[in-house]
Amino acid sequence: MIKAYKLYTGEDGHSHFTEGTVTYKDLKEANSILFKETAPHASYDWHPAPTTQYVITLSGTLLFETFLGEQFTLKPGDVLIAMDTHGSGHKWQLIDDQPWKRVYVAFNEDTAINFVPDAE
């Protein structure tokens, strides 16, 4: 299974995350695919996701944080499932010496995402 973090907006209007895995159930129809690279040590302040999307990290290690202080570390090979398209959003910072190379795969908001949360 592929490690994944799902970012979503809770009923309180703030972003939260759940750790889990991406499953291989079925194909999903994507709206767009975008490749992007950001220089080492970069950061991006508070923002919601522009659309529901997978963000597949190819290189770089990042610290993500929600407005309420929840944090997780995204590593190469991990998938961020960004669903916090409204509310307080999240921020990130590159914490290693590598550029963040990634692939964005955008979906419709009503697309069922193949995600299984870790057992608590």
State each model region's role.
Residues Y44-W46, F64-E65, A82, S88-D96:
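Short beta-strand His + acidic residue motifs that chelate non-heme Fe in jelly-roll/DSBH
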Residues V22-Y24, F67-H86:
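Short acidic-glycine-tyrosine-enriched beta hairpin
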Residues H47-F64, A106:
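Short, conserved beta-strand element in jelly-roll/cupin
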Residues T9, V22, N31-A49, M83-G87, ...:
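Conserved short histidine dyad/triad with adjacent acidic residue
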